[in-house]
């Protein structure tokens, strides 16, 4: 049976959700973040990088969110949650499936990093670290985030979902960046369509079932 190596408050929540949408049976092995929010060393026994998400299935170990989504759709989807091949929607699907981690998440991770750095710096260095962090946020990170959030808002003005009128696995993939942006990027300020997207996904029965299976989930808080 497919096994999800599930780290709390992590991208692996999307994997549970995708499996619930498809009705795939799976087992969960749970891992808790350490006090510094890092994944525990036990995950390295599953994959050398010790990162989440990771799944094991039929003798295969698959890491990386996009690769996992593709594997699950190819293996268990039976044409569901993916547009037909050789259509504009399929091209859009592929783009968003990989954009989520390749382009959307880096500025959100930098936002988290530069926000946490002053809090974790030694007391004597804290004023300097805060100054450097604020400068990086102001000149580099926040402008990038605003650009991405405006991009999402514009795309979601065309249709309810990122690939068109049908919900797909690409929307599941995009959920994490939007949830992170709502938590710490200001998405709730002037991006009503993006926030409505979050309302729609949070209301899906499979999303709620994934929360019940995975446990408490809070992105970037």
Located regions from the model:
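GST-like domain detector, emphasizing the conserved glutathione-binding G-site
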Residues: 1-135
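Short, solvent-exposed turn/loop segments enriched in Gly/Ser/Thr/Pro and often Arg
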Residues: 32, 169, 214
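Generic structural signal for helix capping and beta-alpha/helix-loop junctions
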Residues: 36, 218-219
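Residue-level recognition of oxygen-bearing side chains
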Residues: 67, 193, 206
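Short, hydrophobic secondary-structure boundary micro-motifs
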Residues: 79-84, 106-108, 161-165, 189-190, ...
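GST-like fold's C-terminal all-alpha helical module
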Residues: 100-199, 203
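A short, acidic, flexible beta-alpha connecting loop/helix-capping segment that sits on the rim
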Residues: 204, 214-217
């Amino acid at each position: 049976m497919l096994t999800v190596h599930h780290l709390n408050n992590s991208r692996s929540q999307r994997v549970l959700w995708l499996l619930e949408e498809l009705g795939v049976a799976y087992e969960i092995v749970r891992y808790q973040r350490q006090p510094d929010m890092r994944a525990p060393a036990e995950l390295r026994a599953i994959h050398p990088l010790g990162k989440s998400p990771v799944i094991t299935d039929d003798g295969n170990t698959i890491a990386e969110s996009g690769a996992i989504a593709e594997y699950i759709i190819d293996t268990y989807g039976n044409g569901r949650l993916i547009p037909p091949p050789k259509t504009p929607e399929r091209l859009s699907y592929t783009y968003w499936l990989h954009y989520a981690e390749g382009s959307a998440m880096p500025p959100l991770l930098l936002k988290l990093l530069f926000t946490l750095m002053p809090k974790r710096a030694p007391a004597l260095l804290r004023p300097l670290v805060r100054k450097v962090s604020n400068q990086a946020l102001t000149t580099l990170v926040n402008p990038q985030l605003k650009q991405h959030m405006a991009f999402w808002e514009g795309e979601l003005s065309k249709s309810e979902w990122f690939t068109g009128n049908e919900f797909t696995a690409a929307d599941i993939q995009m959920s994490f960046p939007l949830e992170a942006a709502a938590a710490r990027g200001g998405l709730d300020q002037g991006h009503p369509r993006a926030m409505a997207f979050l309302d729609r996904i949070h209301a899906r029965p499979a999303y709620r079932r994934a929360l019940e299976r995975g446990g408490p989930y809070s992105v970037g808080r």
